[in-house]
Amino acid sequence: YKRQVNDDKSFLDDFEVGDIQTSSFDVTWQPVWGEEKDIRNQYNEMAVTLVQKEKNRRMLIRFRLFNDGLGFRYEFPMQKDLRHFIVKEECTQFAMTGDHTAYWIPGDYCTQEYGYTKSKMSEIRGLMNKAVDHQNIASKVIGEAAVQTALMLKTDDGLYINLHEAALLDYPCMHLELDSENRTFQSHLTPDAVGFKGTLQAPGVSPWRTIIVGTEAKDILASRITLNLNEPCKIQDTSWIRPTKFVGVWWEMIAGGGSWDYTSDYPTIKIGETDYTKAKPHGNHRANSQNVKRYIDFAAKNGFDAVLVEGWNIGWEDWVSNRKEFNFDYVTPYPDFDVKELNEYAHSKNVKLIMHHETGSAYRNYERHMDEAFQFMKQYGYDAVKTGYVGPIVPLGEYHYSQPMVNHFQYVVEKAAKYRIMVDGHEAVRPTGICRTYPNLIGNESARGNEFMSRVPLGHTTILPFTRLIGGPMDFTPGIFELDLSKINPNRHEKMKATITNQLALYVTMYSPLQMVADYPENYERFPDAFQFIKDVAVDWDKSVYLEAEPYEYLTIARKEKGSSNWFVGGTTGAQPHIAAFQFDFLDPGKKYMATVYADAADTDYENNQQAYTIRKMAVSYTHLRAPR
């Protein structure tokens, strides 16, 4: 850390230890939603006060040691010679003992939507160009040897290590830059528009830097260090925060060729001036009342909680990549979308509508309209919003993961909480456990999900739980049954690298309290027996057991439905076949259970026979060994 004004003395050296305080902590707490109903937070703490002799400045480093790793952060007490200061760079280093295997994506100031590369640390620099397999309109790749967190590592002798951060608040997002010669990762903070790596004020703290360690890969998945390093819930009444299973007007546009916009008449749009009542509809706008009612009926028939509708509001004809700030007002619907009628229709069927606020990354415009937009939601009965930040930040110069944008994303979550609104953040900074403090942050994207279709690599969903999901749940949008996308859009000649039962398993392995049932209703109606699993699977859990795992190879997880005796087990693999082997000792002894087993058929093939599956029932018990096949 380095001050900016009239002070060339860094916070790197010339320190002596002024004080050391130790303590212990052990408490069990209950999350509003989660992978288990009880989480134990047990650690030993050491707070080391360092005094810089020349300037007589103090900095405290606080360490918390857990059974499965540690967290540490920097703290800056109030003092005479340190009040406001600029961070030029944080120089935290993680020194490795060998050339470990790394599971990584390129460092980027604006996106995490990459496929993962598995390589030795020493190979990262040489593989970087190949690893940059997706540069969207907002991408800003950092350099030849920078990677993102959470970073998963494996030593040659089989130790698993995870590097990340927790409680990212009022601070830029951290990347890691590799010094290959010294086998050391150094923190690399996302700069703001003028190049600063942070503007801090004493008293203040950095986010926690986390190291999770396990002798088995599944130990990493079971760790709750990230959540435990965040503050307890700050929302007094959480009764309105509900895990949600939903359908949506979304896949029709993402994969099917439908449109978010309403007309082709206007080459440019001015909100408040463009008269849509005089426009001729182009006929491909999917967020129309008739189509939305179809999804509402489908949700009601199958017991789903809500319907997401994207493209309902004016402005989509001219919304991104034009350096345009006033692109949406978040309250004016297109002429073919009746807000009042649709919400009344949905509520009459015990279904909610989920609001969509795409910002086009014009974040200041969103902040100006946020109160009005949230009031509009409450007026019509919306209690959840999916936000989006596609494209470069407007005004230009900021990055998605800079301190100002981290603060913006947090502002949205806290403002939404005041209106009792749940948030599903897309294109936002990757999670760091903030959902413990603000559990209305019920979903995040922040990684490559199903919307990438054929560009979701084999094994991708076996590495995401070790990386992206370490910080919080992901809105991966599973449940695609028609995996040959040319069948829904003749112009799209691609197949997803998946099978129907693979898509079912993701509801268990890719944890989220907000799960989308993403495909067309008619594609589920073609496979009612497989669809039954999606109807049955829970979205909130009493207990999770990580049965077996190896990044990029396989993953098997068992979860017990909250408030029920039902268990769900999901398993996925990478490119190589895998026979799951585990015990059912997570079941209650003395009880017999009936298992409904959904599995790929013997001739299932993700390239040529994606929709073949088998379903059978069999009895299992506490002593049952191996997965039923």
Where does each model-flagged region fall?
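Catalytic cores of secreted or luminal carbohydrate-active enzymes
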Residues: 506-542
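An acidic-aromatic substrate-binding cleft motif
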Residues: 204-292
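Conserved small/polar residues in nucleotide/adenosyl-binding loops
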Residues: 1, 623-628
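N-terminal accessory beta-strand-rich subdomains and adjacent acidic, glycine-rich linkers
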Residues: 2-236, 604-605
